[in-house]
Amino acid sequence: MRVAFLTYSFSMHINIKAKYFSKSNDKVYFFAMHPRQRTKDLDAPLEYRNNMVVTQLIHDDMDWEQIIKNTWKMFGTIRKNKVQIVHIIDMAFAIYGILLSLLGVNVILENNGSDVILASNDPKLRKRYEVAYKLCRGVVQDSYVAQQAGIKLGAPSTNNEIIELGIDTSIFNLNVEKGVFKEKYNIPKDAKVIFSPRTLRPLCNIGEIIDTIKPVLEQYPNTYYVFCSQIRNITYENRIKQEGLNNHVIYLGYIDNEKEMPYIYRDSDIVISIPNSDSSPRSVYEAMACGSNVIVSDLPWIGDKFTNNKELYIVKLHDEEELLNRIMNILSGRTEINAEIAFNGIKQILDYRISEKKLRKIYTKIIRRKNDKRLF
């Protein structure tokens, strides 16, 4: 099967998608969209893309000339290599779904979560999404929340599947060696580590996490906060510097999701993920599989998947007092998740091999019906 994925060039999770298609007759292509304002680090992630053919493209949502150039370049690659499916991850790239579909390409659209959850009040986005949904061959997403948000924006209710992102539990598990991350970044062995794996942007409420640094350091001065994001945020960085917290904050740039991230989770006493909206956050699942004490905001994606105070900790959105209390209780040792139960729960429902089978089934169905003009 010949498959091409299209999403942000700095996507930390594209490798797991490529892993779905590692059989001898599979070939994976990656159209890596790079924001124009970040051309200085254009090739940063390339060293991590060993199992796919990468085409890096500059993307500017307002530059139609560039969008047309990108489309023709991708179409040339698709036609030359007989790519059977183009899987577009994140509706931010819906325009390419429209253009490639009009050129006869089999396009799958993937609702990424916030892209559809937060788009409801933008008329231009709604129209673009509606057209893309109408032309594509199928829609996938990782949660019921994202699926319903997409349907409200025009996604069809048929050929519309929920497929969890999936994680490789042979990589993310309780046997990951401890101390590797701390040693690499010269963090004392007995230090506490609080890790935020989310992008440094307001949606992820990074400011609320920063608010906890001072009070935590007052009681636990040997604590380090680690932020992982390819995208820098000068506002947050300046605030941390002005408040004299630099010596207790570590910024990580692009991190290989499978070669490096497991060691960060394993050495983290706490992993925090408290965005305003979310769908099915794989960083949360990975951290849980590695035995981390994970704190999440009370969003609909959780549903009945996990139990509060057992596999993870749930705090009310924007309740900074509750967040701080959770952190303090964990650092004091008064509370701790059941790592074994958390890992087993993840393995049973979220191992990537389960997702692989589901996605292959959808692709195969579309390829077999490739002579149909539309499926909807």
Report residues per predicted region.
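Short His-centered aromatic/hydrophobic patch
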Residues: 88-94
